[in-house]
Curated annotation (Swiss-Prot):
Gene for this chain: murI
Residues noted as binding substrate in the record, renumbered to the chain: 12-13, 44-45, 76-77, 186-187
Protein family according to the UniProt entry: Belongs to the aspartate/glutamate racemases family.
Catalytic center residues: 75, 185
InterPro entries: Asp/Glu/hydantoin_racemase (IPR015942), Asp/Glu_race (IPR001920), Asp/Glu_racemase_AS_1 (IPR018187), Asp/Glu_racemase_AS_2 (IPR033134), Glu_race (IPR004391)
One record GO biological process: regulation of cell shape
Upper classification of the organism: Bacteria, Bacillati, Bacillota, Clostridia, Eubacteriales
Keyword list, A-Z: Cell shape, Cell wall biogenesis/degradation, Isomerase, Peptidoglycan synthesis
Protein name as it appears in the record: Glutamate racemase
Length: 257
């Protein structure tokens, strides 16, 4: 098999990275994708750094053994902790994801920018470096959201439980003063509609899925690795939990409008 026809690997701590996979498939409809969700060990955002590194390495090896030509680490926590190590250890294009703070700043709406993310993402040096670029001129507030990925892993993406969780998190803010909400975890786009409801649709909601997918396409094009055959690609999903329910949920989220 030529390298152009090999699949693209996607990895996340669970089902969250499917939000990025959806964007990538829209942008690269001829490509085949292999998605590995580590729901057995989710969430990563409250684990120790060394544990996240080991789990990420295991997932990467799983996908490498399936012959992928590129890897998207569709997990903010894993990106912040392991992306440099992965690029040193594997000789394929590796694309990570980080909170889309730059697009939020470039909107120039002038209000508060809230970054929803896991505690580990917000505690890592990679995030601190990102904050340093803008904190002098922008009103940016990190908002740790422990427990939210776990709800989404159970398939709870709407209804009273999600509404009340978000209502509690945003109760300290004046919705009129929020200009943007950055979704700093790939699980969060699945609760975007409820987030709009809680914040009365006042804020612009931004995630990094499109930017990451665009970077994937750019790197594949520059390396002459894009698939040339004119056909519709396919998506195959694996999960460390190895049960039908989590696979069914994964495909349901992938097909969610």
């Amino acid at each position: 098999m030529s390298i152009n026809d090999k699949p693209i690997g996607f990895f996340d701590s669970g089902v969250g990275g499917i939000s990025v996979l959806k964007e990538a498939f829209k942008l690269l409809p001829k490509e085949d994708f292999l998605y590995y969700g580590d729901s057995k060990n989710a969430p990563y955002g409250t684990k120790k750094v060394e544990e996240v590194k080991a789990l990420t390495s295991n997932a990467t090896d799983f996908l490498m053994n399936k012959g992928i030509k590129a890897l998207v680490v569709a997990c903010n926590t894993a990106t912040s902790v392991t992306i440099n190590d992965l690029r040193e250890n594997y000789d394929i294009p590796i694309i990570g994801i980080e909170p889309a703070l730059k697009p939020a700043v470039e909107l120039k709406k002038g209000g508060k920018i809230i970054i929803m993310a896991t505690p580990m993402t917000l505690a890592e040096k990679k995030f601190a470096n990102l904050m340093d670029l803008y904190k002098e001129t922008e009103d940016i507030e990190p908002l740790p959201c422990p427990g939210l990925p776990e709800l989404i892993e159970q398939g709870i993406v709407s209804g009273d439980i999600i509404y009340n969780y978000l209502k509690d998190k945003f109760s300290k803010y004046d919705n009129e003063k929020i200009s943007s909400i950055v979704l700093g975890c790939t699980h969060y786009p699945f609760i975007e509609e409820t987030l709009k409801e809680v914040t009365h649709n006042k804020a612009c909601i931004i995630d990094g899925s499109f930017g990451t997918s665009r970077e994937l396409k750019r790197q594949l094009k520059n390396s002459n690795m894009l698939r040339e055959e004119n056909r519709v690609g396919k998506v195959t999903i694996f999960n460390s939990r190895e049960d039908k329910d989590i696979i069914d949920l994964s495909y349901k989220l992938f097909n969610m409008k």
